[in-house]
Amino acid sequence: MRSGVIAQKVGMTRVFTDAGEHVPVTVLKVDQCQVVAHRTVEKNGYVALQVGVGKAKVKNVSKAERGRFAIAKVEPKRKLAEFRVSEDALIPVGAEITADHFIPGQFVDVTGITTGKGFAGGMKRWNFGGLRASHGVSISHRSIGSTGGRQDPGKTFKNKKMPGHLGVERVTTQNLRVVRTDPERGLILVEGAVPGVAGGWIHVRDAVKRKLPAEAPMPGKFRELADGAAPAGAVQAAQAAPEAPAAEENA
């Protein structure tokens, strides 16, 4: 089981196949997605990778986080996430996962926060049919109708589908096909729509209900920084991290 990546939704466009058919795609940008830490069975009880993406200002990062980024020699990241992996799919700390981690033709699952719609009625929120346009109905054409309460049970049950806040929910869309990747610009083009607004953070991982293609790189496609070449942000974080107190000598 391989690691996923954190990407930023750019928007939607279309690409054309060799047969001249157009395919609607969502463009996802992977911006310096680096491995920040490992989770191991011995220390944490499970195996996972903590990855970060984007750049965060050092002043907006807590001292504890600065220390962790300094240990990993990674610039402070805007967004962090964990992905469960198998023990043979661990990627070195500090390595940058590139867009060609996924190959064209494979299927992925994407997770994002849906667009907020505010307070919505039952017809928009739950696809209710509403009431009749005439025949004695006035004013209440878009109402939900009866909520099911009568003398018994004498109340409306919890979780009844009613008007309320719509959107801003964590949603996973499964089995989206990867149409194209551009590792130089860090772009992944997936077929179809992806939940969330433009600029929102999206988690992309191998589809759990589809077999991983044999051509997919294991443990993943990544590039490592040169030895001793720590990012500038990591150096600033190390300088800002608190120093350990000096040990006192016994008299």
UniProtKB/Swiss-Prot annotation:
List the InterPro entries hit by this protein, alphabetically: Ribosomal_uL3, Ribosomal_uL3_bac/org-type, Ribosomal_uL3_CS, Transl_B-barrel_sf
User: Which Pfam families does the entry link to?
Assistant: Ribosomal_L3 (PF00297)
GO biological process, alphabetically ordered: translation
Modifications the protein undergoes after translation, according to the UniProt entry:
Methylated by PrmB.
Q: Which GO terms describe its cellular component?
A: cytosolic large ribosomal subunit
- Region annotation (Disordered) maps to 140-162, 229-251
Write down which residues bear the modification named N5-methylglutamine.
Q151
Keywords for this entry?
A: Methylation, Ribonucleoprotein, Ribosomal protein, RNA-binding, rRNA-binding
UniProt GO MF annotations: rRNA binding; structural constituent of ribosome
Task: Indicate whether Zinc appears among the record's keywords.
Answer: no
Its annotated function is as follows:
One of the primary rRNA binding proteins, it binds directly near the 3'-end of the 23S rRNA, where it nucleates assembly of the 50S subunit.
Assembly and binders: Part of the 50S ribosomal subunit. Forms a cluster with proteins L14 and L19.
NCBIfam families reported in the protein's UniProt record: L3_bact
Q: Which family does it belong to?
A: Belongs to the universal ribosomal protein uL3 family.
Q: What is this protein called?
A: Large ribosomal subunit protein uL3
Lineage here is:
Bacteria, Pseudomonadati, Pseudomonadota, Alphaproteobacteria, Hyphomicrobiales
Q: Which gene encodes it?
A: rplC
